[in-house]
Regions:
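Non-heme Fe(II)/2-oxoglutarate
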Residues: 1-76, 96
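A short coil-to-beta-strand element that immediately follows conserved catalytic motifs
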Residues: 76-86
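Catalytic core of non-heme Fe(II) oxygenases with the double-stranded beta-helix
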Residues: 88-130
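Residues at beta-strand starts and edge strands
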Residues: 10-12, 82-84, 105-107
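Sterically constrained small-residue positions within well-ordered secondary structures
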Residues: 6-7, 79, 100, 115
Length: 130
């Protein structure tokens, strides 16, 4: 038998810079309502379908292309995936975002609109789901 390397349960991560202006989207995000999540100071938009709004048309197209690129190049699939939900999170000073999983997702994504360089970057944890 020949030696073989099997990569079981890999976690691919694709990073794609968004080069367009986000001024219009940022202004819109300032006008919508948010609700505190789990008492840790993190706020989530009441609207969980932001990509349905005209203000997010360009971002919707960008994210759709990114998902298709990931599906084709990483998952090696011709199946087109659809983004089902999209919401905004706000984390004021002193707040944190809770660790969580997306068990019903094939692909999950994050897009940062404003980043405070003094804060730690996004963190990922490996969980064993039984």
């Amino acid at each position: 038998m020949k030696e073989e390397l099997l990569q079981l349960f890999p976690t691919p991560l694709l990073i794609i810079p968004y080069e367009q202006s986000i001024d219009k989207e940022l202004e819109y995000l300032k006008t919508i309502s948010y609700r505190e999540q789990q008492g840790n100071g993190n706020y989530r938009s009441d609207d969980s379908y932001l990509l349905r709004n005209e203000e997010f048309k360009d971002i919707k197209n960008f994210l759709g292309e990114a998902v298709n690129k990931f599906t084709t190049n990483v998952l090696n699939s011709k199946q087109r995936l659809v983004i089902t939900q999209c919401w905004a999170n706000r984390n004021p000073k002193g707040s944190k975002h809770h660790e969580h999983i997306h068990p019903n997702s094939i692909v999950s994504g994050v897009m940062y609109f404003q980043i405070n360089e003094k804060l730690p970057p996004i963190q990922f944890a490996k969980t064993n789901q039984a």
